Amino acid sequence: MTTTERPDLAWLDEVTMTQLERNPYEVYERLRAEAPLAFVPVLGSYVASTAEVCREVATSPDFEAVITPAGGRTFGHPAIIGVNGDIHADLRSMVEPALQPAEVDRWIDDLVRPIARRYLERFENDGHAELVAQYCEPVSVRSLGDLLGLQEVDSDKLREWFAKLNRSFTNAAVDENGEFANPEGFAEGDQAKAEIRAVVDPLIDKWIEHPDDSAISHWLHDGMPPGQTRDREYIYPTIYVYLLGAMQEPGHGMASTLVGLFSRPEQLEEVVDDPTLIPRAIAEGLRWTSPIWSATARISTKPVTIAGVDLPAGTPVMLSYGSANHDTGKYEAPSQYDLHRPPLPHLAFGAGNHACAGIYFANHVMRIALEELFEAIPNLERDTREGVEFWGWGFRGPTSLHVTWEV
């Protein structure tokens, strides 16, 4: 069956970016039921929405990575998430050594635990906090920022950068001609990149002459002939990828996990009483609200039929992993957070040879941060006077999380 035989999909013409940013689940629930692979006009792209189709496309030899148009406009080339072949192999060999489990285990506790404790000390005696801004995001960005070598950049600036890059990357709407519907929406991403370069260029100058153990210093030198370094223009797109995706994912993942646990008070109590359950709570939080919801894509390298749809060579497909993780064909009552759900694999970190390189690091940042939070404030409660609003289609998480506790 081809898309021309699906007149019932005319409703997709009315879907807007605002609708997807506010709540993509309604649209994607219908897509999963009616057309697991469908062309969505506002995105100018085919979209995969079920677990089966997302995994099939992500792992198929008939597809390779491609960056979305808005992502390419934001990051430039060669960004690690959108390249293939020798360039992808080189970039993965550049970033992966510092993220190997044996390497992460060597320093993760000493890196993250003092950061988490430092932020907790600022509010643990107040009896109230907004955890996204005061804890989850700062711990996430500070942990990665220090790993990269950006100790001189304060956490609020790192949060500002990833927010601006996020809005630029997800400025995905196109008009009937396939042109960006809101080209001015890339301006703040350009501003963030200019600020990033103003800070990082002098550091790169220093690291070229005086290498240290920071990640970006290793990116410059590792695997290169003596006396040579990778060109900064070659690594900047991947720096931007890290400053967006890798900066926000642990923060939004732990915030979503907390919101999920607050929806099941008895499960929150279990996790507080038994911290060994924290990794399981995080895995369910990532499935329940995937931080990287629909930000990656593939492109067909030959004519192929997927989910009954004939795709010519050169057809991009967006992979909506957040939708795949709500697939009723795989998960029972997927819109409900459930710590005791059978531990099935999820797609929050992607699949195939472009799966997230930082899975182990991100999981341990979240684990340590929640361990410290529950140890310091075991009687944490959501402040029900304040609502919880989730936002985002490419990247998704709670915009705020107000909590209270007795001091």
UniProtKB/Swiss-Prot annotation:
A GO MF term: heme binding
Residues annotated as binding substrate: V241, G245
Pfam families the record matches: p450
A single BP term in Gene Ontology: catabolic process
Catalytically driven reaction(s): guaiacol + reduced [NADH--hemoprotein reductase] + O2 = oxidized [NADH--hemoprotein reductase] + catechol + formaldehyde + H2O + H(+); 3-methoxycatechol + reduced [NADH--hemoprotein reductase] + O2 = 1,2,3-trihydroxybenzene + oxidized [NADH--hemoprotein reductase] + formaldehyde + H2O + H(+); anisole + reduced [NADH--hemoprotein reductase] + O2 = oxidized [NADH--hemoprotein reductase] + phenol + formaldehyde + H2O + H(+); guaethol + reduced [NADH--hemoprotein reductase] + O2 = oxidized [NADH--hemoprotein reductase] + catechol + acetaldehyde + H2O + H(+)
Heme listed as a keyword: yes
E.C. number: 1.14.14.-
Stored Gene3D superfamilies: Cytochrome P450
Cofactor(s) listed: heme b
Pathway where this protein functions: Aromatic compound metabolism
Keyword line: Aromatic hydrocarbons catabolism, Heme, Iron, Metal-binding, Monooxygenase, Oxidoreductase
Positions of heme binding: H88, R92, R298, Y321, A351, H354, C356
The protein's role, per its UniProt record: Part of a two-component P450 system that efficiently O-demethylates diverse aromatic substrates such as guaiacol and a wide variety of lignin-derived monomers. Is likely involved in lignin degradation, allowing Amycolatopsis sp. ATCC 39116 to catabolize plant biomass. GcoA binds and processes the substrate with electrons supplied by the GcoB subunit.
Family: Belongs to the cytochrome P450 family.
Known partners and oligomeric status: Monomer. Forms a heterodimer with GcoB.
Protein name from the UniProt record: Aromatic O-demethylase, cytochrome P450 subunit
Organism in which the protein naturally occurs: Amycolatopsis sp. (strain ATCC 39116 / 75iv2)
Lineage: Bacteria, Bacillati, Actinomycetota, Actinomycetes, Pseudonocardiales
Gene name in the database record: gcoA
